[in-house]
Amino acid sequence: MAKIQLNGKEVVIKSNYSILDLLKKYKLANKKVAIEHNGIIINKTNYRKKYLKDNDKIEIVHFIGGG
């Protein structure tokens, strides 16, 4: 298990959890999102490869259409 900060809130996740796993957990995997991992914007092609560890800070911004 690992504790991360997700959008400013502490969350406990399983070990070997990728950014893609996190997006799936919150039903955001098929949404348009921007991910910041420890202050660095992560390219969508790396969501599956980037694994989270204890004390990581993740910010997820998802886009909502409107007018």
Description of each model-found segment:
Residues 1-9:
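Eukaryote-biased recognition of intrinsically disordered, low-complexity regulatory segments
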Residues 18-27:
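Short amphipathic, charge-patterned alpha-helical segments
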Residues 37-38:
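Cytosolic Rossmann-like ligand/nucleotide-binding regulatory domains
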Residues 42-47:
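Short alpha-helix capping/helix-loop boundary micro-motifs
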Residues 55-58:
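Loop/turn positions that initiate beta-strands
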